[in-house]
Structures are given as structure tokens and as C-alpha cells.
Amino acid sequence: EYKASVLSLREKYREQIDIHLGMEVECYQSEWEDLATYRKDMEYCILGQHQIVLNGKSSYDLRNGDELKQYVDQIEYACYHGLCDYIAHPDACMWIYPRIDDGVRTAAARIAEISAKYDVPLEINCGSGVRTGLSQYEDCVRYPYPVCIFFEEAAAHGCRAVLGLDIHDPKLFFTDEYINRALSVVEGLDLNI
């Protein structure tokens, strides 16, 4: 139904705007066949691993290096199999993660290595993470995401980056506030945006 609707709108408005067929996907190895089918049908597949479940926890509720490793393993699996065109909010795992520790540094470096190896851009997300505002964590005050360490690693590895407006209210398209907040996190980094 989604595909038919988008293709119908593309045809109807072809003289006025370009409409592309795409969707945000999550990578679960048990769903490999469905993911491969979606990938063939879509012009764009955006990987958003925000609903991965790890021992009863979503990626918004990770608290240790082992859980971060599992999160990154899912991202690597998707990129290895060519299931995505870019990685949405690669740092969403930091939503409540308490501090920037060795597990975070390892995850950030691995995600940058994966991005560079498979030439899959990383999204600087201008949505939920910055809309909630700055929060106090054990070691600093920061947005839940984007998180600077991830994009320091991206810059060091020469990764491409994209800005993503992950918003759920069309009125938010009329403000640059959240874009500016997200860009403030990566200011001064030599990113290929």
C-alpha cells in the first residue's frame, strides 16, 4: 500500500517535484529475507536501529559496553549486506547512556570504521535528541544525540555525513533551531557533509 501510494504521487506530481521511494528500516538477522526484498524495492533505505531489543532493552536504554557492541554489530550486519543508504542517528544508543567511557569510544570508532569501509554516510540527527534539550549525564551536559565523539571519529575516518530532520510534526520544518543545535555539536570538525 505504501509503495503504491508513493508511486502514484510521484506520477501525479512528476512535473512539480521529485518524489523518491524510501523507508527507514531496522536490521534483524531473523528478518533478512524481508529486508532484502525491501532493499530491492526502495530507492532509499535508511537504517535506524532504535528499536533493537537487547536482553529486554531497546537501543535507547543501553548502559554498558557489551550492549553497545551488540548495537554496533547490528549496524555492521546491515552495512555488510548492503541494506542501507545511510545510518540514521548512529548515536541514538546514547539517549540514557550515563557517560562517555571506553565502551562508547569503541562503539564510535567501530561505527566510523563501518561507515568508511562500506561508504555509508552517518546522519547528524536534527530531531528528538536535540528537541529534548541539554541533559545532565554523569560526566557532562549534552544532548542525548548527536554526540560529538561519534562525529570526531567520523571526521578522523573520512566518513561522509548527512543532516537528517527526523521530525514528526510538519510545523518543525519552518524553524532552523534544531538544525542549529545539532550543528553546534559538530562545529569545528572536518566532516564531509
Predicted regions mapped to residue ranges:
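Charged catalytic cores and adjacent phosphate/nucleic-acid-binding surfaces used
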Residues: 94-95, 99-193
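Extended substrate/RNA-proximal surfaces in nucleic-acid metabolism proteins
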Residues: 1-118, 123
